[in-house]
């Protein structure tokens, strides 16, 4: 098992090296041929999202933006691209090392004119490299700064780490917090499972409630804590468990416009990273709740929608990820009632209500029980 994972890692490193060299060679050849260097990238805007019938996710369309040395700004962007490409090849891939996105920003202090002015600039450049190579930043050994999310449930895995191989049962071998998902889940192999569903949960409070109430055991459920807007590794492992193991996925969030976008990022991909949708999105994922109709049906405690909430809901009515009749009805209902609710509002009905009444009823309604 360890050799299998190690071989995959070697293959990924070779592919990343090849793609980065191709990019560097393209820019070099433009200089050689006395052509003003330039690169083209998909426009990362909502208006450039297109639905892929092949993969059932939203991806970037045909609109492009150009980075060209015809302008001073474009020339600096290309300079920084070449410095970053060289660094990733020589320092990361050649030496089997990695850096966080924050570290890359500080590393650039030694690049003189190619130094990044702020971290947002270096983050965007890594996204550019993903688009240009059609690879994920994990292939370049780039790590996020934040900790990974956690999961808890009846699944056994093998994880290859820098210190060797680990065999882990995500119920029996972990503490109350669950198994911490690593930033690169390609280093994980699934060994066995008894799961009948995956419940991806927005808040830590609801994740802990389902664990304490034994929902994972009662329904053979893998519980995944999304920690708000989910990290890429969290979305990727959900997709892998769904596609490779055939485990259905339900997403359980708060009942507000920002939480609906959390669901959309799991199911269809985020606008900012639509180039990775086919790699990370799980189009089979279903929205469990909290629905605006649940607020009405269960008479949950609520907060009034803010102007920001209202504007976000109206924006979602034109978001291609929410174009179904179901979403238009739910969003319009929420605008009509002017209310939002948190997952923990179910506690007002008793600590067991969410696991004994709401979830079983809703999962049956969704055809998952």
From Swiss-Prot:
Identification of the protein by name: Type 2 DNA topoisomerase 6 subunit A
Limits of the Topo IIA-type catalytic domain: 11-149
Catalytic center residues: 106
InterPro entries documented for this protein: Spo11/TopoVI_A, Spo11/TopoVI_A_N, Spo11/TopoVI_A_sf, Topo_VI_alpha, TopoVI_A, TOPRIM_Topo6A/Spo11, WH-like_DNA-bd_sf
A molecular function GO annotation: DNA topoisomerase type II (double strand cut, ATP-hydrolyzing) activity
SUPFAM superfamilies: DNA topoisomerase IV, alpha subunit
Family: Belongs to the TOP6A family.
Keywords, ordered alphabetically: ATP-binding, DNA-binding, Isomerase, Magnesium, Metal-binding, Nucleotide-binding, Topoisomerase
EC numbers for this chain: 5.6.2.2
Classification via CDD domains: TOPRIM_TopoIIB_SPO (cd00223)
Keyword Isomerase: yes
An example Gene Ontology biological process: DNA topological change
Domain of life, per lineage: Archaea
Catalytic activity: ATP-dependent breakage, passage and rejoining of double-stranded DNA
Function description: Relaxes both positive and negative superturns and exhibits a strong decatenase activity.
Cofactor(s) of this protein: Mg(2+)
Assembly and binders: Homodimer. Heterotetramer of two Top6A and two Top6B chains.
PROSITE patterns tied to this protein: TOPO_IIB
Source organism phylogeny: Archaea, Methanobacteriati, Methanobacteriota, Stenosarchaea group, Methanomicrobia
């Amino acid at each position: 098992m360890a050799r299998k994972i190690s071989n995959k890692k070697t293959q990924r490193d070779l592919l990343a090296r090849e793609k980065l060299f191709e990019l560097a060679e393209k820019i070099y050849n433009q200089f050689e041929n006395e052509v003003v260097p330039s690169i083209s990238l998909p426009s990362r805007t909502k208006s450039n999202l297109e639905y892929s019938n092949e993969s059932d996710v939203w991806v970037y369309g045909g609109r492009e933006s150009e980075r060209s040395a015809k302008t001073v700004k474009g020339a600096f962007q290309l300079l920084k691209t070449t410095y970053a490409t060289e660094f990733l090849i020589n320092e990361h891939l050649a030496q089997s090392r990695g850096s966080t996105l924050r570290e890359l920003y500080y590393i650039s202090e030694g690049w003189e004119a190619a130094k990044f002015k702020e971290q947002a600039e270096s983050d965007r450049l890594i996204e550019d490299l993903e688009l240009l190579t059609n690879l994920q930043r994990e292939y370049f050994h780039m790590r996020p700064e934040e900790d990974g999310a956690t999961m808890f449930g009846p699944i056994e895995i093998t994880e290859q780490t820098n210190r060797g191989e680990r065999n882990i049962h995500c119920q029996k071998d972990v503490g109350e917090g669950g198994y911490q998902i690593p930033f690169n889940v390609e280093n994980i192999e699934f060994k066995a499972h008894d799961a009948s569903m995956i419940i991806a949960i927005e808040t830590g409070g609801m994740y802990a409630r389902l664990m304490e109430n034994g929902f994972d055991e009662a329904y053979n459920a893998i519980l995944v804590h999304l920690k708000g807007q989910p990290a890429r590794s969290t979305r990727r492992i959900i997709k892998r468990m769904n596609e490779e193991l055939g485990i259905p996925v339900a997403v359980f969030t708060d009942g507000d416009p920002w939480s609906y976008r959390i669901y959309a990022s799991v199911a269809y991909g985020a606008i900012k990273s639509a180039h990775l949708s086919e790699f990370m999105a799980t189009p089979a994922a279903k929205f469990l709740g909290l629905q605006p109709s649940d607020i009405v049906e269960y008479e949950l405690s609520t907060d009034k929608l803010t102007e920001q909430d209202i504007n976000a809901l109206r924006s979602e009515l034109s978001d291609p990820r929410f174009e179904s009749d179901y979403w238009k009805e739910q969003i319009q209902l929420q605008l009509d009632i002017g209310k939002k609710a948190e997952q923990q509002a179910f506690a007002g009905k008793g600590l067991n209500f969410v696991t004994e009444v709401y979830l079983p009823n809703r999962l049956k309604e969704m055809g998952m029980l």
